[in-house]
A protein has these predicted regions:
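Conserved helix-turn-beta segment of the N-terminal RecA-like "Helicase ATP-binding" lobe
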Residues: 137-163, 170, 174-177, 337-341
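Charged, low-complexity intrinsically disordered regions
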Residues: 1-61, 127, 151, 175, ...
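Conserved SF1/SF2 helicase motif Ia
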Residues: 106, 113-144, 150-154, 309-313
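Generic structural signal for small/hydrophobic residues in well-ordered secondary structure
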Residues: 55, 87-90, 94, 102, ...
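Pre-Walker A (Motif I) flank of P-loop NTPase domains
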Residues: 97-102, 128, 181, 312-314
């Protein structure tokens, strides 16, 4: 809940500003109403039993399957390489359990798991053509590791030249006509393979319908005009995308992704695709982003296609950091890998997921410029966590460093050494300038294209490293971080 006051600008124009005191009081009342509702819900035994039964039947009905890969044989694998038990179990999950998230820590052997699963899928007839998508710097390493694990594997590796405009059509034709055990390419190359315009249009129209429903719902409840305006703006942007899609004539007439015969996708470092746009009626809540990356939307469309043709199998994501910044990242991973399962539970959009498994909290936080504190609302508290984790673990194979007891060198002294560095007069002066700029941004006194909080945060990080990253003529602080690092490295070297 946010209370805004209308401020007239003259000439019939006006804008809204947040009333901090009234907002605090309204949110306190909101929390009281939530507590009263909980008390009312459980006060009547019959009513309580009704909703407890509904919740258990809908969400608390999962017994997690345990996968044992000890019996697996790997024809064609290098006999000098022996996979560890947790790797065999993960491969068994991929083969038997459908879409999988390999949420394993660094050094757990995710690459070998995907490679072995890829070859076994092909051998068992579970997949005919697999594409392995990896970060650009790892293409060569992935290819050599694949051939080390399976020396006779028939793999196609995309080079940088293969996706140049003059050669792209030829390379994509090789994918369509060749019988490969695995096709290895980079994240950016994978994005250049187009998905059909019809599929894009269906997705955009579904999002527009969802927003239109939410707008009608907000209006019927006399919801905030501010929120309705934001949703109308978002709806208009999506409609413009559909129009652009209809008018678009592809510069190079490539075969679409659906026509390549690919029926399995394996994505290494899958956290690179977590920035998926999420539509929500909640506004001004940190941790929820309505703007997403184009490559994430492209990945979502391709994953939807693979799930459709394979019955919710054929997708493998691998990352050591599936959830690192916000709770929404868990929803995004579920959207990629288990959307039908969510829909079976009546969860068709983010707000429904958030209502069941999350909560918005408001607390005092340090301002961006570090000059004081402000109340900030964040979507950062899980509710019904045991049930959510059971749903998540249906696709997620989680292995932490503690679970695997990996041989990691211990820190000298058992903990990190804190080295303090004092700011000089120049750093303090720039920090004061950040305060002035932040206040101007909050009051709408500067165009966002000229200055914004993201710019201040970026400059503050640079300043925290060394002032000369912002201004090459800034004074050299002898007590600065870089000088401290250089001094410590020299002492260690001595």
């Amino acid at each position: 809940v946010t209370v805004r006051d209308r401020v007239d600008d003259g000439d019939g124009k006006y804008h809204y500003v947040v009333n901090k005191n009234e907002t605090m009081l309204a949110r306190e009342k909101q929390n009281q109403m939530k507590e009263k509702f909980k008390e009312w819900l459980f006060a009547d035994p019959e009513r309580r039993a009704k909703y407890v039964d509904y919740y258990n039947e809908t969400f608390n009905n999962i017994r997690l399957r345990e996968y044992d890969g000890s019996h697996l044989q790997f024809p064609g694998m290098n006999p000098e390489i022996e996979l560890k038990p947790h790797q065999k179990n993960a491969i068994a999950r991929i083969l038997l359990g459908g879409n999988t998230l390999l949420a394993h820590c660094v050094g757990a052997g995710k690459s070998f798991e995907m490679m072995a699963a890829c070859m076994e899928q092909k051998r068992l007839g579970l997949a005919n053509k697999t594409v392995m998508v990896v970060p650009k710097p790892l293409i060569g390493q992935t290819a050599s590791e694949f051939l080390r694990l399976y020396p006779s594997a028939n793999i196609l590796v995309a080079t940088e030249r293969d996706f140049e405009k003059s050669r792209r059509k030829q390379f994509i034709s090789r994918i369509a006509t060749g019988d490969y055990d695995c096709i290895i390419m980079s994240h950016s190359q994978f994005e250049k393979i187009p998905i059909s315009a019809e599929r894009k249009e269906r997705m955009l129209q579904a999002q527009i319908d969802e927003i239109a429903y939410a707008i009608d719902d907000m209006k019927s409840q006399n919801g905030e005009q501010w929120t309705v305006k934001q949703m109308e703006s978002q709806k208009k942007k999506l409609q413009e995308q559909i129009s652009a899609l209809a008018d678009e004539s592809r510069k190079d007439d490539l075969i679409t992704f659906e026509e390549l015969g690919i029926d399995s996708i394996m994505v290494d470092e899958a956290h690179a695709f977590k920035n998926l746009a999420i539509f929500s009626k909640m506004n001004n809540v940190s941790g929820i982003s309505s703007s997403g990356a184009k490559k994430a939307t492209d990945m979502q469309l391709k994953c939807q296609y693979i799930s459709e043709i394979n019955g919710n199998r054929g997708i493998v994501f691998a990352t050591g950091t599936p959830i690192s910044n916000t709770m929404c990242e868990m929803y995004v991973m579920q959207l990629y890998l288990q959307k039908p399962a969510l829909e079976q539970m009546g969860i068709y959009h983010f707000d429904s997921w958030a209502a069941n498994f999350g909560e918005v909290t408001t607390a005092l936080e340090l301002t961006v410029e570090g000059s004081g504190f402000r109340f900030k609302s964040r979507f950062n508290k899980f509710t019904n966590l045991p049930e959510l984790m059971n749903i998540y673990r249906e696709v997620a194979d989680v292995q932490t460093a503690d679970m695997l007891d990996l041989d990691v060198p211990a820190l000298r002294g058992g903990k990190a050494i804190i080295v303090e560095s004092e700011p000089d007069w120049y750093v303090k002066q720039v920090m004061e300038d950040f305060v002035v700029r932040a206040e101007r941004i909050r009051n709408g006194g500067v165009d966002p294209s000229v200055d914004n909080f993201l710019k201040i945060t970026h400059e503050a990080r640079l300043l925290g490293t060394d002032a000369r990253l912002i201004d090459k003529d800034a004074p050299n602080n002898p007590d600065g971080k870089l000088n401290k690092v250089a001094e410590n490295v020299w002492n260690e070297y001595q």
